[in-house]
């Protein structure tokens, strides 16, 4: 149904929840009309995936509605589970009645074919006799509740709806159905009593087992036995895993995008702990009971429950390494490792920190309990993490792309990277034993270094001696065969710390190129001289111009450029470092974590309006939800609303259509917000001068 086809009652059915909605409650920016409730529930960043899943289910379900047999007696079950003798007892008259289509049903089937673009070159009887199941809703089984609690948080639109008899036998090439959406009765082959292994299909000759478009590994040719790697619980578990991973990626996205502003408002003990732990990422972890199950911790954050002032440490773990499969808690990844190790899905784990071990230094074999590094007192920020327990960061060159890079990449590039990574690790994930790729550590003589003071996901360095050419990068942002973006004189590349270099020892550095929109306000080194470091000077430019200054020996020029039209707002920071004395000497000291200020916004000064630059009261102003730097006073917001016209869509007062996070849809003011802003001048007390 298109946007213009609205019923006479001015109500439109949502494609997902199928409830009648008024036009103002519908959103037409996606491939199907959906209501605002479904978009808010699923999230704008994954609503297309839910729509595509629902489209696949509706495709298969439309055949059942248009070609399913009429009501049967209460004693009849699903026809594809009937005894062969009962199947043989069907007379020609019964067959004709079962497959009879009246005018209304034909029209419904035709509309379904037209809507979903399926061909009608199918024989009249080439479909499965799928009767309505006596219990369950339209053949959809009840979702399983046997999995761990963390894997059961699902939306009603993305549950494992793999009921029997939903997808008929099709001509090959007509419909490409993912294996996790194919009913189990069709994947398992025919019942044992069927002669010749032919399925229950009334038609012109036996149907081949490949008529579903199922991959050869999922369908058995001539063997009626059930595939050993496929079961209904496996399918439900796979759907739950996809849902859990999507939720974890959403949490990661929210954590990285709001990191700078949120960390600025947290207590000093929380900020110090987060900065210290972030400087040690990524590092490897393994399961205590099976050392072949490896993952890596790549991000930390602090979360607090609503209404409470206490913060709790939150960590993000990728398991298996290089799979881009994210877990947002230690207990979650420990449960998954335990399931992969013991194949026991009923037992739960008390604490993931007791079952995970981390390697203090890569290749040293010094594995320690993660609970010793992060005891309860550290996880609740009562004590600082022990410096002697901190691991050294290590990025495996065999899988250099961290999941946090997916947050920063464009959507098409991120999807391609996730697809290639999942394809490469699919064999390991399905075998039950997940191992990390083995690859040699790069030679320390290659001029590569590890910058420990920057957050995860942005450790992309390119090393070159002074006067030489920057080292080439074989993968931009960790994506194979992608050209590096033109961000500066060097190509961004994630590197690993040299094995021979001490943790905080000297190491050569040439350029830091890319800081993506994970930070609204990037970390900038403080001025000063510490541990033989050259003084670091930071020059901040406005959003519309870039300041530059000549690079002199023993100095660092920082340039910050804020781009308000790069996705949902981004900040780029480029540091150009000149070696001391102008000679290619490898003895330049590394930027240490202690040079990073306690708060990334400590020196940002008072809040000011983006338009008039007047000082803002800290609780009464308009904040753009997409671009952190877009802050507006009420008079400027009122003028912008009047200029745009309060009767239509009113976008960001900056004059730009700032998109929502994870979407291309621009945000707009609600009518209540417009009324509040236009109500009159709000007299508030402004912040005093310090």
From Swiss-Prot:
Q: Which residues form a coiled coil?
A: 231-263
Q: Where are the zinc fingers (RING-type)?
A: 609-656
Enumerate the UniProt keywords alphabetically. Answer: Coiled coil, Metal-binding, Nucleus, Zinc, Zinc-finger
Quote the biased-composition stretches of kind Polar residues, using this chain's numbering: 207-222, 557-567
Pfam families to which the protein is assigned, alphabetical: IRF-2BP1_2 (PF11261), IRF-2BP1_2_M (PF25457), zf-C3HC4_IRF-2BP1_2 (PF25454)
Taxonomically, the superkingdom here is: Eukaryota
Where is there biased composition of kind Basic and acidic residues?
A: 234-245
InterPro entries named among the record's database cross-references: I2BP1/2_C3HC4-RING_sf, Interferon_reg_fac2-bd1_2_Znf
Give GO MF terms, alphabetically.
transcription corepressor activity; zinc ion binding
Q: Where in the cell is it found?
A: Nucleus
Q: Does the keyword Repeat apply?
A: no
Give the GO terms filed under biological process for this record. regulation of transcription by RNA polymerase II
Establish whether keyword Cell membrane is in the entry.
Answer: no
Gene Ontology CC terms, in alphabetical order: nucleus
Family membership, please give it. Answer: Belongs to the IRF2BP family.
Q: What is the name of the protein in this document?
A: Interferon regulatory factor 2-binding protein-like A
Q: Which organism is it from?
A: Xenopus laevis (African clawed frog)
